[in-house]
C-alpha cells in the first residue's frame, strides 16, 4: 500500500499545481488531530505522517501547501477553534481601547487572526 496521500499523488501529475489550505492556518493543527483521532486504528500513523507532509508549522516551506485563503467566516472558525484564547484577546482589546466601538474591535481582532495565520505560512 502506498503511503502517499491523494493530494501527493495529484501533485505528481502536475508539479506546477498549487495545493491551498482553504481555511485559517490557525485551525490546521486541531483539524489534523481530529482527523487522526477519528481514523481507523490501522491508518492513524499513516494519516498522521501524510498530514504532517501536507503542512508542518515547524517547516512550512517544505510542506505541500502553497497558499491559504482567509475571510471573516474562516477567521471566525479560528476563533471557535480556540475560544478561550480569542475571548481573552478580545476582552483585552476592549479594555485597551475604551473609545473603540464594536466594528473597530472586530477589525482589530480580525487583522490579528489573519496576521497570526500568515505568520505560520511566511516561508511559503
Task: Give the role of each language-model region.
Residues 17-23, 42-46, 66-70:
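Hydrophobic faces of well-ordered beta-strands that scaffold small-molecule active sites
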